[in-house]
Every structure is written in structure tokens, then in C-alpha cells.
Amino acid sequence: MVINKVEICGVNTSKLPVLKEKEMRELLISMRNGNTTAREKFIKGNLRLVLSVIQRFNNRGENADDLFQVGCIGLIKSIDNFDLSQNVKFSTYAVPMIIGEIRRYLRDNNSIRVSRSLRDIAYRALQVRDRLISKNNKEPTVSQIAKELKIPREEVIFALDAIQDPISLFEPIYHDDGDAIYVMDQISDNKNLDDSWLQNISIKEAMKKLSDREKMILNMRFFDGRTQMEVADEIGISQAQVSRLEKTALKHMKKYV
């Protein structure tokens, strides 16, 4: 059977059920009470979610059946770990876990590992790219980025290719005795980045769980690009307080992103 050019052996997508939010919640409650029939129905009712996710990996030359099986593992993990007490849609919670499971599978089955030095070059290249865009109001060429970094053009291309798989916004890329620097700090919002749609949905849902002060601090830090000291001056607290509030907010958000 074919769904948007993804072939899955043994899956008749035309007969896959579609569950409404209310029905999903009722099934989840029933599952928590040990109802195995409800669990099976819930899994079948969310297989379309897995199919929609694996379409994003179409161009990698991977076997769609394998990706589907791995995606189903991610779906089941999502079901087992989903917290009904949180006001979050199941799909919002499940999609990142399904994608994460597929990425782990791809990493584990890829003989090429991305070295620390390559990642460092890639992050520096992304920083330079953002700076040049801000300065010139247009996308820089790879040659321009390489010139800024004073390294060969081919090295920049190789490094950026090596981190093609999207990286978590909360992945620390540097930390000293002070605050960690996250990818979110270094890369501006870009609609063309892979999975930007997913990050946008997840971040919006996660931000709803924060206090007004936490929202304001994260908006100023990561969307307005201000330093912790600038935020502290703006809202009238110390830099240390900003740091603590920021870390607490990020910790809360990581539960949902």
C-alpha cells in the first residue's frame, strides 16, 4: 500500500482508524486501568501518525518498512510515558518521541560518526551565517562563510553535511563553570530548518506551561537575542536570578519538547 509515496508492507492505510481527541483520552484512561483492548485500539488509531512522520525521512534511502517498525516503537514508548495530567495533546507529545526513535536508529546504523571538531565547525559556520544575514540582509554563500572562518570551503560543506540531522534546541554546545550555551542561543529561527514545524508546535505548547516571568525571560533571551545582563537590567533583578529562572524554565520545557 502506498501513502504519499511511502510503501508499507502489510498495512492497509485506507482502513486505519482515525481517533478524535475525546476518544483518545477515554482510551488512555481505560488503558491506565489495564484494558489491553483499549491499548490495541489506541495504537492502531495512531499508526497514521507514524506514517506521517516517516515521510520526512523519504530522501535518505532507508527501508520504509524498517522505519515504520522503529516509528511504532517510538509510538508505544509515547503511550507508555504520556502523562494524562498534563494539558498537552498526545500527538504533540508523541511526534518528537517517534522522530527521536527513528533518529537513534539511523545514528546506530550509520557507520559515520560526527566528531566534536566537525560539530564545532558547523556551529561556528551557523553563527557566521546568521551574523552575515543580519549584516547584509541576504543569505551568504558557503565561500563567504569559509572566508570568515578562515578555513577551506570544502571543510565548511563537510561539517554542515555531517550535522544534517536536526539537533535539539536544548543540546548544550559549550559550558564552563557558568551557564551552558544551548543551540537555541546560537541559531536564529529559520523556517527552512528541518523540523522547524515540529519545534514551533512543541515550543508553543511548552511555553504555555511557564509562568509569565519565565515566558518573558525566554522570549527576551532566545527570540530577542538579549544577554542575561540585559534581561536583568530590563526587569529589575540580578543576572544570577535571571540565570536561575532561565534554567528552571528550560528544565520545565524539556518535558514537552
From Swiss-Prot:
DNA-binding region per UniProt: 228-247
Pfam families linked to this entry: Sigma70_r2, Sigma70_r3, Sigma70_r4
Matches recorded under InterPro entries: RNA_pol_sigma-70_dom (IPR014284), RNA_pol_sigma-B/F/G (IPR014322), RNA_pol_sigma-G (IPR014212), RNA_pol_sigma70 (IPR000943), RNA_pol_sigma70_r2 (IPR007627), RNA_pol_sigma70_r3 (IPR007624), RNA_pol_sigma70_r4 (IPR007630), RNA_pol_sigma_r2 (IPR013325)
Name the UniProt record assigns to this protein: RNA polymerase sigma-G factor
Species for this entry: Clostridium acetobutylicum (strain ATCC 824 / DSM 792 / JCM 1419 / IAM 19013 / LMG 5710 / NBRC 13948 / NRRL B-527 / VKM B-1787 / 2291 / W)
Gene that this polypeptide is encoded by: sigG
Listed PROSITE patterns: SIGMA70_1, SIGMA70_2
GO biological process, one term: sporulation resulting in formation of a cellular spore
Homology family: Belongs to the sigma-70 factor family.
Short motif (Polymerase core binding): ranges: 66-79
Keywords, in A-Z order: DNA-binding, Sigma factor, Sporulation, Transcription, Transcription regulation
Keyword flag Transcription regulation: yes
Task performed by this protein: Sigma factors are initiation factors that promote the attachment of RNA polymerase to specific initiation sites and are then released. This sigma factor is responsible for the expression of sporulation specific genes.
Coiled-coil ranges per UniProt: none
